[in-house]
């Protein structure tokens, strides 16, 4: 650029001596400004830069942090990396230990190791994610999922996720990648296996319901037996009481009449009942004889 400006100045027609000096100063200032602009660059927040020079290649010992930096124009130029963690979703069909097809998806939060950027650039370039992540994720998923049955992938999902995270983190270190988080976002099976699992669950629910009905019937049967035994015992005791003292039935009538009269007394309606309606007839000779015998028996 500076050489072009000098050539342009040489082709200009000669003028007054002062004008030529001013033009040379102007061209010199332009060349200096261009050189300064090309010598300065900025590394933004969350980024790192490395130098590539045209003689020695990538400088292994230079990793530039955020801020303003200088370089030698044409001889050096910066290569800037974004070192912030970025999410990526990767899906992979694989097979379980019992030969069931499993569709599994992972969310991987990854970033480059800032201390190894020069070697990463030499091996992988700037598109390191596309070159590395899909292949190592598929490799680890197939290795881990093959250790579990399809049912275990559901019941032991936390353990499966932990094992995938551990192996994938170690595998990524070989490519200067740091994984901040690995999580299973989707886990699905083939239609045939899903239908078989649903049918099994329905059968288990029906078996549990049948077992519940059987247990309920047994409980009801036991309850009826206990109730029948209680009624038989009560009838037996009542028969013994009547055989020993016929006045017992009269006493039951009195208690029944008391309950009836108490109910009528608390009612807002006025009701008139005869002694017969009260299950109590004081003029009944059998009642009098039974009551007297009851009183004598108590004495």
UniProtKB/Swiss-Prot annotation:
Domain of life, source organism: Eukaryota
Upregulation: Expression increases approximately 3-fold upon entry into G1 phase compared to other phases of the cell cycle. Also induced following inhibition of mitochondrial protein synthesis by thiamphenicol.
Sites of N-acetylalanine modification: 2
One annotated GO molecular function: protein heterodimerization activity
CC annotations in GO: cell periphery; cell surface; cytoplasm; mitochondrial inner membrane; mitochondrial outer membrane; mitochondrial prohibitin complex; mitochondrion; nuclear matrix
Coiled coil: 190-238
Tissue localization of expression: Expressed in myoblasts.
Ranges where the record places region LC3-interaction region: 121-124
An annotated GO BP: mammary gland alveolus development
Region of interest (Necessary for transcriptional repression), residue spans: 19-49, 150-174
Protein location: Mitochondrion inner membrane; Cytoplasm; Nucleus; Cell membrane
Keyword Lyase: no
Keywords attached to this entry: Acetylation, Cell membrane, Coiled coil, Cytoplasm, Host-virus interaction, Membrane, Mitochondrion, Mitochondrion inner membrane, Nucleus, Phosphoprotein, Receptor, Repressor, Transcription, Transcription regulation
Modification type N6-acetyllysine: residues: 147, 200, 236, 250, 262
Pfam families in alphabetical order: Band_7
PTM info: Phosphorylated. Tyrosine phosphorylation is indirectly stimulated by IGFBP6.
Chief location of this protein within or outside the cell: mitochondrion
Described function: Protein with pleiotropic attributes mediated in a cell-compartment- and tissue-specific manner, which include the plasma membrane-associated cell signaling functions, mitochondrial chaperone, and transcriptional co-regulator of transcription factors and sex steroid hormones in the nucleus. In the mitochondria, together with PHB, forms large ring complexes (prohibitin complexes) in the inner mitochondrial membrane (IMM) and functions as a chaperone protein that stabilizes mitochondrial respiratory enzymes and maintains mitochondrial integrity in the IMM, which is required for mitochondrial morphogenesis, neuronal survival, and normal lifespan. The prohibitin complex, with DNAJC19, regulates cardiolipin remodeling and the protein turnover of OMA1 in a cardiolipin-binding manner. Also regulates cytochrome-c oxidase assembly (COX) and mitochondrial respiration.
Recorded family membership: Belongs to the prohibitin family.
Quaternary structure (record): The mitochondrial prohibitin complex consists of two subunits (PHB1 and PHB2), assembled into a membrane-associated ring-shaped supercomplex of approximately 1 mDa. Interacts with ESR1, HDAC1 and HDAC5. Interacts with ZNF703. Interacts with STOML2. Interacts with ARFGEF3. Interacts with SPHK2. Interacts with COX4I1; the interaction associates PHB2 with COX. Interacts with MAP1LC3B (membrane-bound form LC3-II); the interaction is direct and upon mitochondrial depolarization and proteasome-dependent outer membrane rupture. Interacts with IGFBP6 (via C-terminal domain). Interacts with CLPB. (Microbial infection) Interacts with SARS coronavirus/SARS-CoV nsp2 protein.
Record note on domains: LC3-interaction region (LIR) is required for interaction with MAP1LC3B/LC3-II and for Parkin-mediated mitophagy.
Protein name: Prohibitin-2
């Amino acid at each position: 650029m500076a050489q072009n400006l000098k050539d342009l100045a040489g082709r200009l027609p000669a003028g007054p001596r002062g004008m030529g000096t001013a033009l040379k100063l102007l061209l010199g200032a332009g060349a200096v400004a261009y050189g300064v602009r090309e010598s300065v660059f900025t590394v933004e927040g969350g980024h790192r830069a490395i130098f590539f020079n045209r003689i020695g290649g990538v400088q292994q010992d230079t990793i530039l942090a955020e801020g303003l930096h200088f370089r030698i124009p044409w001889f050096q130029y910066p290569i800037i990396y974004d070192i912030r963690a970025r999410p990526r979703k990767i899906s992979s069909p694989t097979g379980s230990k019992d030969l069931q097809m499993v569709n599994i998806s992972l969310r991987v939060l990854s970033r480059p190791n800032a201390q190894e950027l020069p070697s990463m650039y030499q091996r992988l370039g700037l598109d390191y994610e596309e070159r590395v992540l899909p292949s190592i994720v598929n490799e680890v998923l197939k290795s881990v999922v093959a250790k579990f049955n399809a049912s275990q992938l559901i019941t032991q999902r936390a353990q499966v996720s932990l094992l995938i995270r551990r192996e994938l983190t170690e595998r990524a270190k070989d490519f200067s990648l740091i994984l901040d988080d690995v999580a299973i976002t989707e886990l699905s099976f083939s239609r045939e296996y899903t239908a078989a699992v649903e049918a099994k669950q329905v059968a288990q629910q029906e078996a549990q319901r049948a077992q519940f009905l059987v247990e309920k019937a047994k409980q009801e049967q036991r309850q009826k037996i206990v109730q029948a035994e209680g009624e038989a015992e009560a009838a037996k005791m009542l028969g013994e009481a009547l055989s020993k003292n016929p006045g017992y039935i009269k006493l039951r009538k009195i208690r029944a009449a008391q309950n009836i009269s108490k109910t009528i007394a608390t009612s807002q309606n006025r009701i008139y009942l005869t002694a017969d309606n009260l299950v109590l007839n004081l003029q009944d000779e059998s009642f009098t004889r039974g009551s007297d015998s009851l009183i004598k028996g108590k004495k």
